[in-house]
Amino acid sequence: MPTKFRIYTETFYNKTNAQRLPVMLYLTLSLVLAIVSTLSLNNKKQKKTRLVSSVLTWVMLIHTTLLLALRWYVSGHLPMSNGYETMQFMAWATLIVTLVMQKRFLPVKQFGPLLSSFALLVAMITDGNPQITQLMPVLQSPLLSVHVMVIMFSYALFGLTALIGLQGLIAHHRKQEEKEQQLAALSQFLLFPAVALIAIGIFIGAIWANVSWGRYWSWDSKETWALITMLIYSAPLHADIKWLRKAQHMHIYMLLAFLSVLMTYFGVNYFLSGMHSYA
C-alpha cells in the first residue's frame, strides 16, 4: 500500500503536470525572445532579452526539475520509459546545456528555452501525461536509463545546432558575414560533444541489449537510424569535406541533418517496427 505522503505527492503531481498554460507561456515567451534576439541590432534590446532569457531559463529548469523529481518519486523509477518522459527529460537537458554554455555562447542562450519549450509541447501533445505504471522487468536496468539520458542530451545539442543553423541562414540573408561565420563555428564546436554523446549512448545501449536480449546489435529500426544519425553528424567534423567549409552550406546541413533525429525519435515509432516500439 502506498503511504499517505506518496498519495498526496501523486495528487499534487497530477494537478501540477496537467496544466497546459505554463507550457504555452514558455513557448510564446521563448519564441518572442528568439525572434527579437535574432533580428534586433539594438544593444539595449539585446541586454534586456538576455536578462529575460536567463530568468525564463531558470524558471523552466525549476519547473521541469520538479515535474521529473515528482514523477520519479511516484513511479519509483527514473522517468525514461516512454515518449512523454523522454521529451520532458530532453527539455530539462536542453536547459542544463543552456545554463552551462550561455555565458560563452550567446546563441545557445537565445535558443535553449525555445528548444526546451518545443520539447515540452511535443510531450504534451503526443502522450499527454500517460498513466504512471510499473516497468516491465526488461526495462528496469540502470543501463537503459543511462542509455536514454545520454542519447537525449545528444539530441538536445543536435536541436540547438539546427536552430543555430536557422539563425545562420538569416544572418546570411542579412549580409552579416561575421555573424554567419561565428554561428557556423559554434555549430561545429557543439558537434564534438553531441557526436560523442550519441556514440556513447549507442555503446551503452548495445551493452544493455546484450544483457537483456543476448546480442549487442540486431539492426533494429531505431538502432539503425541512431547509427545513421551519428554518421550524418560526424561528416562535418572531417576537414576534407570542402563543401561544408562554407558557412551557408554548414547551416543548411545542420537544418537538414536534424531530420535524421526526427526520423530516429518519431519516424521509427510511427512508420517502422522493432524492439524500440515502446520508446
Regions found by a protein language model. Give the residues of each.
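Polytopic transmembrane helical bundles with strong interfacial aromatic enrichment
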Residues: 1-279
